[in-house]
Amino acid sequence: MKKTAKVFSAALAATVALSNVSALACTGLYVGKEASADGTTIIARSEDISPSDYQKVHKVVPHVENQPGRVLEDINGFQMPLPATTYQYTMMSDYSTAGDGVYPAVCSNEMGVSVTGTVSASPCAAWKEADPYVENGLREAVLPAAVACCSATAKEGVENLLKIVDEYGSAEGNIVMIADQNEAWIVEIYGGHQYAAMKMPADAVAVYGNQFMIGLVDPAATEGYIFSDELFSTIDELGLAVKEDGKYHLAKSITDETRSDGNNMRTWIGHKVLAPSSVGAYDSDTFYDLFYTPDEKVTLDDVMGIYRNRYEGTEYDADLPGNEGMRAIAVSTTPETHIVQIHDDYPTQSAAVTWVAPGGAEHSVFLPELSGITDTADAWKTDSAIYTDNSVYWTFKQICGLADTDRTLYTQGVEDYWTLQEAMMQAEMEQVGEQAKTLYAQDEAKGDAYVTALAEEMVEEQMANAEHLYAELLTVVTHNNGLSSGKTPVTFEATTALREAAQFKGYTVGWNAADGAITLTKGSDKISLKAGSATAVKNGQEVELSAAPYTQNGVTYVPMSFVQGL
């Protein structure tokens, strides 16, 4: 989560000056493989950047074989020699003229290692003075790439990261997660040189805001922990130690037992969603546990839902009058949200399925790709500070921009549309995984080509869906904006392509060319409807639709409420 940056667009030079960019509300999430419904390990994070017109560019950094003399560098003066050979990895970087560095955000490499970083966090004032940041030290701007380019395992990724902090220092307080098919780690960098790393339990989950989270640890622990040499002595010398049965509570000690509601509340709501039985009402003074057991196995839908959460169902609902200042997980300033699912039974180079919601999860869709991709769609590589056609980011962000204007009227309709698309993509990805395993077993190049083409096809399909959704949403927003005083605004409901939605729900779709009647059959159920008529017939009974179906370019569209009722 970047703290400050400069944004400049030459095209807008006459009207827009350099503007500060700040990050407010990145949220990290972890689901251990024994806690997930499908046995995958999940690490996830939302980026947060303000202002919110901040394009992300998705690309693949190729494998480099035996080319010594290269360096990894950052605009703050950080320079680190690279190994002669570096691994291929994916990344989700800032647009090139953003002015504050690369910010790879989330990387998965050919060795099956994935890293997401960072969630920024701050220690107390006394700690900052004792362990000051290093001005030209390691920043989030290059951190994920520094790990992904040269780490063959998650553990090696942790060790490489900590060696960098030891040698070059850190310019920021950061939280990072690194995972592979065998294990997952969390790393907390507290200042210029002090840190703690912990292997995350496979049977637990975690959701956290911008605050250090590692709790009670034994300073003598070696299995599953790595501590900087002077971590505990620094805590003791500053008189900050908070102990229990001889163990140090790192989060309480490093922060001098302080929490910010804007961060702590996001940690609490994650716990409340995944394990309501073990957490009560929100309490500002509570240091919520980093890890806990979920009440039920966690699904991918659960994780997506958390990243769309705005404290609905609580008194802190960010959309209620008086709660406008609440720092929810889902915010308008999110340029992308990513969820990395690591499959133990997938080929190493494609072990991770990364789901990316361009423009933020609340009003966008999660697009999947396997980590073995060797290239990304051209629309992912569009690099511009201002709106441009054929851009993944802008295609989805324009929907977010409209829906954000009135969540009461527009959010549910947008989320309903994307939830259906995500359900269909999840079903497809189950088949894709099996096909990928078969192809990789035959030939690695075949496997790579397959997953690359598939990712590009899914991007193209969902961009087309986004354009359809945007057109409908823009129509309703424009209608509502022009209403006379006292008129009731329209609540948005999207339409979706009937054939693919009905087939996904298990229906056979027939069409009568003579009268244009469309028939859906599933077992004993039979539904008949026509474009232009808001009345359908289900098993002999008339049913009123919320709007009449319509046909455009040979595709019949029906209201989402009709599909939800199938």
Identify the meaning behind each predicted range.
Residues 12, 16-20:
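Hydrophobic core
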Residues 21-25:
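Sec/Tat signal peptide C-region and signal peptidase I cleavage site
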Residues 1-9:
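Bacterial N-terminal signal peptides that target proteins for export
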Residues 476-566:
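Primary recognition of N-terminal secretory signal peptides and signal-anchoring hydrophobic helices
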